[in-house]
């Protein structure tokens, strides 16, 4: 059940009505309804996945309590590592086993040995990377005594399985979401209205921007061997806006839906393509994942407290693990490695920005220097996105190579569909809207909000009529 589907358009109002008019007696009935709705939502992909979600929920609920109750450090460590190993074990089996089996077989073959890997015919459960990280952060925080264990199973189950964030984030923290589900929510008209605005803007990003760019990005990447330089450059740009519109659109919808139920989720995107360097980009892009790796991997490794080489080592570890988190393919690992390389000049010059607000708070007309920094950062991310999108490392390298070897800057035709100036104009308008609204979480809100909403709905209907591309990219992670 996708957020941009008719099924969800029917599902959401039903849950909303039941939540506020039938199950609104107390927080327990509200939470119970949301859990049932979440389990139904998740089972729409494959009901068998539900067993793994329930098991993971019970595992971390039980081990969290045992960690808190244990009187000895040995006992605390036992329950802590049990949760860590089982969670990562399931993630490894479903997501990475075949990748490692094939990689080792290829390595042995390269040395002249015959190897036939034993592969598992497993379907990757939707959202496993996200809800596994929810549970891991909860158990880690209990072990380090940052939070108390949650003894109410219903409340904890909702924290893990809450349907807006279940399959593609944001990756929530127990310190942020659990206190909200432990109290009864009261309906607030203004909050609900903001939620509707944010849902509509998320659909604009997904249906109008991402799905339209996907048509051309897919055609270019699938036929890159016959494309000229201009087409390949456009293909990388189209994919950059496809993945941004797709993922940030999903996050906007998730945040908006949560506001309808009186819950506040972590913001996941903060206009990342207006970043002036790669460090700022990663403070604005997939914020919940970046902060998760910072708090649970980078800082425990020593963070930035050590010398230069420790900072470099930790940065490379973080980005390679981040690439690996995204998928079991060498292209994702190379993508992470490239982003780590982008960090090197900042680490060597000790100019890693901590303040991400200055470019947002200042003028509508920026200086040439700031504009150059923004464009340079965007182009660097586009180069990295080529590896993220390509099927193999070889495809990515050849794609980039053809940009410099097949220098032709004319429009090309794709499957009898021409590149149209309207798409580039649409992206340009989208960028201007983002820039003009960079201080807002919901760009539709504010003055003339009803007019903006009407125009947004018309755009969704118009583009949705001609778009067959439905699935959100991050569902595969």
What is each of the regions a protein language model found here?
Residues 1-429, 435-476:
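Membrane-embedded transmembrane alpha-helical bundles that form the catalytic cores
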């Amino acid at each position: 059940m996708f957020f941009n589907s008719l099924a969800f358009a029917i599902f959401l109002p039903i849950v909303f009505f039941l939540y506020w008019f039938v199950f609104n007696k107390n927080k327990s009935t509200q939470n119970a309804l949301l859990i049932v709705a979440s389990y139904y939502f998740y089972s729409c992909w494959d009901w068998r996945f539900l067993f793994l979600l329930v098991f993971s929920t019970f595992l971390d609920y039980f081990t969290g309590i045992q960690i808190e109750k244990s009187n000895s450090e040995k006992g605390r460590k036992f329950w802590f590592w049990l949760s860590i190993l089982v969670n990562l074990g399931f993630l490894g089996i479903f997501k990475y086993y075949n990748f490692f089996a094939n990689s080792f077989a290829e390595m042995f073959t390269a040395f002249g040995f015959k190897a036939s890997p034993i592969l598992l015919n497993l379907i990757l459960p939707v959202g496993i990377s996200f809800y596994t990280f929810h549970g891991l952060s909860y158990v880690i925080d209990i072990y380090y005594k940052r939070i108390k264990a949650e003894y109410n199973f219903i409340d904890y189950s909702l924290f893990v399985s809450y349907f807006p964030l279940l399959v593609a984030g944001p990756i929530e923290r127990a310190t942020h979401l659990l206190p909200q589900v432990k109290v009864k929510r009261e309906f607030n008209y203004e909050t609900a209205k903001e939620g509707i605005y944010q849902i509509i803007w998320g659909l604009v990003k997904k249906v109008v921007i991402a799905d339209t760019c996907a048509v051309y990005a897919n055609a270019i990447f699938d036929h890159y061997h016959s494309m000229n330089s201009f087409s390949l450059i456009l293909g990388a740009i189209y994919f950059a806006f496809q993945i941004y519109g797709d993922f940030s659109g999903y996050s906007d919808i998730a945040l908006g839906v949560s506001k309808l139920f009186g819950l506040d989720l972590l913001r996941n995107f903060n206009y990342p393509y207006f970043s002036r360097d790669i460090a700022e980009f990663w403070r604005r892009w997939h914020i919940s994942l970046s902060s998760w790796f910072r708090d649970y991997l980078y800082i425990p490794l020593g963070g930035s407290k050590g010398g230069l080489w420790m900072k470099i080592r930790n940065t490379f570890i973080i980005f390679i693990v981040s690439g690996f988190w995204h998928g079991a393919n060498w292209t994702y690992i190379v993508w992470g490695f490239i982003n780590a390389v982008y960090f090197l000049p900042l680490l060597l010059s000790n100019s890693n920005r901590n303040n991400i607000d200055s470019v947002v708070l200042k003028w509508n007309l920026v200086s040439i220097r700031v504009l150059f920094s923004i464009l340079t950062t965007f182009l660097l991310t586009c180069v990295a996105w080529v590896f993220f999108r390509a099927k193999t490392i070889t495809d990515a390298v050849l794609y980039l190579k053809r940009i410099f070897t097949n220098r032709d800057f004319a429009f090309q035709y794709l499957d009898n569909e021409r590149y149209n100036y309207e798409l580039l104009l649409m992206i340009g308008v989208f960028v201007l809207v983002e820039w003009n609204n960079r201080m807002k979480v919901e760009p539709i809100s504010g003055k003339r909000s009803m007019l903006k909403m009407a125009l947004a709905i018309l755009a969704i209907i118009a583009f949705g009529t001609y778009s067959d591309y439905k699935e959100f990219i991050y569902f595969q992670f």
